[in-house]
Amino acid sequence: MPCGEPVDIENPCRTTDGSAMLGRHRSRGSNRPPESLLSICFSSNTTAGQFTAHGQETDEEIRKSRARRGVNKSVRPEAAPDEDLLARERGKRRGMLLRGMTRPSRPILTRCFARAALVVAAALLGGDASLAADLDWRRLGSETTEVLADVIRIDTQNPPGGETAAANALARKLEAEGIRAEVFESSPGRGSLHARLPGSGGAPPVILLAHLDVVPADPRGWRFPPFSGALEHGYVYGRGALDAKGVAVVELMALVALKRSGQPIDRDVILLATADEETGGKAGAGWIVQHRPELLGNAEYLLTEGDHIHLAHGGRKVVQVAVAEKTPCWVKLIARGEGGHGSTPPAQTAVTRLIRALDKLRRYRTGVRLVRPVEEYFAALAPLEREPLRSKLAHLSEALEDPAFLAEFTRNPRQNALIRNTMTPTVLEGSPKTNVIPEDASAQLDCRLLPGERPAEFLALLREVIADETIRVETLLSFPASSSDSTSGLMAAIRKLAATDLGGAPVIPSVIPGFTDSHYFRDHGVASYGFVPFVLSEDDEKTVHGINERVSVENLRDGVRRLVALLRALSTR
Ligand SMILES: [Zn+2]
């Protein structure tokens, strides 16, 4: 439970007196904690797009420091460009026909080698070698890249969204493959897509979910315009490349690949490409669950965004699957007061009341609480670290009682967010004129609660801290947190994929500080998991919601292949 120690919410990661939070071990002011080891060790674990304001500052500082050192580019070697794609891209720029272009023929030996490699890859995947050999992954990868570039070019910035055009583009691709697709709107322009690839019916369906809306993109600072879908050095650039049009297109192409293989799995595979995730999903996934629940069939599992295969320093891969999420409790504080001319102010105005309330919140620090999924997450990561960190993560509850370790641990914004509720002031509104005192002034707070927290109790605490009955607290978005079983058949299938396709990479059930549309489906009884089969470095992750968002052609191709392997592994259980 929150302890109520006054602190600075502008800097939730500052070194603090841990004794107040945990009730023991007073820290000595003279002992400055050592440089955080965790923020280095866990740098690969940052979940893209879920940073607090503090995290953004940190990222900005890193960028500035890199610029000072003259390091502008990713140190990660870039994948070799796909020649076919580059040729097509050049063709597009020259205004040539986009489709049906003759491919340059490759030497027969290369083709034979490619076919042999596919058979070997299929064997490694533990699947049916003839099936995998029949699928032309290179061609599927090229098609995936083309479809993604086309969909990125459809501007679906939310607000207002306008996802129908993107949903229609995906529907055309599916129908060209003989897969029936339906596009429906929750309101004009807010379209979502549903498609269902029939299986042999031995097991309940699995849903692949991704959203088609994107966060706004200011073209300043981008290497290419954010809605160009440009291809350079083996990467597709554009808003939504990773979050989440790239995911939607890989999921769609997995249906296409399974259809082309002629060997259905034992489950129906349902694709949902939805509107409105970025502003809470009420006009997309939420609308579907409420108004079209029949589209979910009696699905057992759902896969969506949330986590992925992390590429840590030294090239080590760690598969993280989000099984639980923090939950949003977005609120608006509204202060009222007498309006008037700025030259003759009364003692109290709406603006001064609001500032006083925000200052009280700024001084308040929420308490540390280690919830079970978070404890299990760090315990699972422990074997990947060296001593003494390994033991501390394995027994995190005990370790956090040491104020020095707590300070070190919470210096990393993501780790800090995983052990407490957070409150981040974001939107401020007052008068539009310098010389006019407004009657209303408001502030929006992006609060995030740990799994198991009750929003009503949190709001009561918020009112208690503000201690001003004239300030109205309105809830903008709130729902209870949910989680999925980390020992399910789907998790077993992901472990099988990691063993056969990812060199035995460890599989870690994770908790993410942000939220996805998963909760709508968990509430409907579908076990939902945040896992995208892309291998992403920290540099890749930083492009989500940032500038130069991009996904590699290699990830698109391997993503489709891995997803097909995963669905087949799920099928054979
Ligand atoms: Zn997203």
Predicted regions and their residues:
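Short, low-complexity, charge-dense intrinsically disordered segments
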Residues: 53-59, 81, 88-94, 105
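Bacterial N-terminal signal peptides that target proteins for export
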Residues: 100-117
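Bacterial N-terminal signal peptides
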Residues: 114-127
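Sec/Tat signal peptide C-region and signal peptidase I cleavage site
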Residues: 128-132
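Acidic/His- and Gly-rich active-site-bordering loop/insert found
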Residues: 133-241, 248, 258-267, 445
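Metal-dependent amide/peptide-bond hydrolase catalytic core
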Residues: 133-134, 307-317, 321-564, 568-573
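Acidic/histidine-rich catalytic neighborhood of metal-dependent amide-processing enzymes
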Residues: 235-236, 242-320
